[in-house]
Amino acid sequence: MQTIPSTTETAADFDAVIXGAGFXGLYALHR
């Protein structure tokens, strides 16, 4: 884990939440 959160990582996490159980969401969570 990085000490400084990246903007892309935050956006991916937010997208995962929107996505929910969607494939994109799972991909973002795995990534």
From Swiss-Prot:
pH dependence: Optimum pH is 9.5.
Temperature optimum or stability note: Optimum temperature is about 36 degrees Celsius.
Top EC class of this enzyme: oxidoreductase
E.C. code: 1.14.13.105
Induction behaviour: Induced by growth on limonene, carveol, dihydrocarveol or (1R,3R,4S)-menthol.
Annotated function: Catalyzes the NADPH- and oxygen-dependent oxidation of the monocyclic monoterpene ketones 1-hydroxy-2-oxolimonene, dihydrocarvone and menthone. Is able to convert all enantiomers of these natural substrates with almost equal efficiency. Is thus involved in the conversion of the monocyclic monoterpene ketone intermediates formed in the degradation pathways of all stereoisomers of three different monocyclic monoterpenes, i.e. limonene, (dihydro)carveol and menthol, which likely make R.erythropolis able to grow on these compounds as the sole source of carbon and energy.
Quaternary context: Monomer.
Protein name, per record: Monocyclic monoterpene ketone monooxygenase
Organism: Rhodococcus erythropolis (Arthrobacter picolinophilus)
